[in-house]
Amino acid sequence: MTKSNNLLADYAAKKQDICIKNDTISDSLFREYGVNRRLRDVNGKGVLTGLTNISEIVSFKTGEDGSSVPCDGQLWYRGYNVKTLTNNLRPGEFGFEKIAYLLLFGQLPSESELAEFTEVLGRSRTLPTNFTRDVIMKAPSKDIMNSMTRSILTLASYDPLVAKAGIDNNIRQCLSLVAIFPMLAVYGYHAYNHYENDQSMYIHRPDPKLSTAENFLRMLRADNQYTELEARVLDMALILHMEHGGGNNSTFTTRVVTSAGTDTYSAIAAAMSSLKGPKHGGANIKVMEMMRDIRSHVKHWDDEDEVRAYLRKMMDGEVFDHKGLIYGMGHAVYSLSDPRERIFRGYVEKLSVAKKRDNEMNLYNTIEKVAPEIIAEKRHIFKGVSPNVDFYSGFVYEMLGIPMELYTPLFAIARIVGWSAHRLEEIVGMNKIIRPAYKSVMKEIE
């Protein structure tokens, strides 16, 4: 740290207690004024703040008496159940591009429309001249989300129509970012790995004829090689992370910032800043850290009682990170099940067999079975507890040889589609800035 940074650090350390004292608001005041903290009710359900035609999450159904009854989770993209969309993919078909078209434009493409869309994306996987050298490689960062965000904001200076209004211009900008996000992520990682870890660096150009999943693996690996199963599993992971309603933190951020009238690059950079937060986009990393801890402390992975005993210690805060949590279990919205996890699980099993890691898959199965029981023993829960998609996604990425630094960027490569769809919907349907109210509880000083 520089002298000025040391000075600031010392000053900040002296001021933190007074900051905490004067910025703490009692929970009783939230109850007194009927304010739902974090825009969630006491059961964790999000407060209704808008309408969307892009997706829907179903976790409860209305009973005969009008009460909410927990049900198996459902995720809908533009009126289609995601389970149906994925089941209807033809043998040999990658689905990311087709479902991206659906989310962006509101209807499934015809054969010719899909071919045109795929070609446009493929031919748009290019960066400005010397951008990789001058921007990505000049300031490598271990935090690839920071690297990508910097690149996104810098790209705005290369766009002569950066602030031009109009749906067509915003579609152009969104599609450009969808196309190049894999490049920003992979190239950012290679630059970091070379300059910080002294590893060999290779920059592979994407193949415009390949899918997003294939290009990601091709650009990441030194030999450009991947199996069809690897690419299909990654394609499914991307599909299941593309969109998850308007209320998730990064998508809501996109809509809030878009409502201010800012440009596409700034709106997506804001969404990236939200997603990089460990409470949002880093869940699968915590699962992987937890699983490594379990593998190192549980001697017999097939012994359900031994696994159960260790998970109880975890819930009691005695082991791992001492926070009393089993990561990858439960969800802010879903109750009985996460539909993404149920779809993804079959792909994970196939990959684990191909990678000869089915013994680890069995450990995941055991945890999936016993963890909800242990959580129910230790906690008062308002709804069911089941594994979410993050429970398996990190395991998949590890089996694919994807470094942990790219786990959250992969989330972004998928979610940029949902962000773009919500940005376009916000531009089309809204002409007022989003401006919620805050109740002041400060004491006036004479």
Q: Positions of the model-derived regions?
A:
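Non-transmembrane, aqueous-exposed alpha-helical and coiled segments at domain scale
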Residues: 1-446
